[in-house]
Amino acid sequence: RAVKFEDIPMSQKRTMFNVLSEGKAALEDEFAVDFDDDVISALTDHASGRVRGRYLYGATDANWNATHATALTNIDGTNDMLSTAMIGVAKRKALIPVNATAKIRPARFKMGKDSEQWFTLWAHTFALRDMVNSDAAWRNRELNLTPTGSNSVLFNGSAFKGAWEGVLVYENERLPLVASTIQVTENLLLGAQAAAVVWGQRTKFNEEEADFAHDVSYELHEIRGIEKLVFSRATEEDNGVVHVFSAAVAD
């Protein structure tokens, strides 16, 4: 990504902020958005690794169908809203491989000299809305306490919504929405080694001046690839993600 500023002396006179500093920050923000979108695109790729033990369509495993589009039609707007029960089912799919070969390990997070193991759930804004409004267990603050060590960056910020049965729950409005019988979303329960990011060239920042520094261009550049990890067993299966589809009807 790149951005160019022209006639900086005049542009600076028309603003109350530093044009170059704000432009550089905006470029970095857009670069981060691109990275996030690429991670989500990789994790939500169903072309490989799709087995019943890594997918949950709504509240019950019985909604599974070998054809992905058909399975989506089994999700309804009443019984298949995201819930703590669905989070529990997804976690058990990860830990106890039924219709899959291997378990999914939780990710290990370093906390100073110690470490903790957690699964994480990225949930769409509409899915979280349904769980907050409809699931009494989630609303029970005695059960939905912030984990020990709440000063960690893992448990802060507006995206972090709480923890349930060893699963850290985060809001992610960029998860895909899919039109089916109703609108549904793909929430992601993630363990260790769900995806890989590989760089051929690490991120570099470049600056170029022209017209005696009246014009300035900034560029962020990298060579990288992001892919969901799929283990090649007798049947290929996703290595570290359970796909949790739920209702996501718009307001």
Give residue spans per PLM region.
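Long, contiguous amphipathic alpha-helices that act as assembly "spine/axial" helices in icosahedral shell
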Residues: 1-64, 111-125, 210-223
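Sequence/fold signature of self-assembling virion shell proteins
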Residues: 62-106, 118-122, 126-251
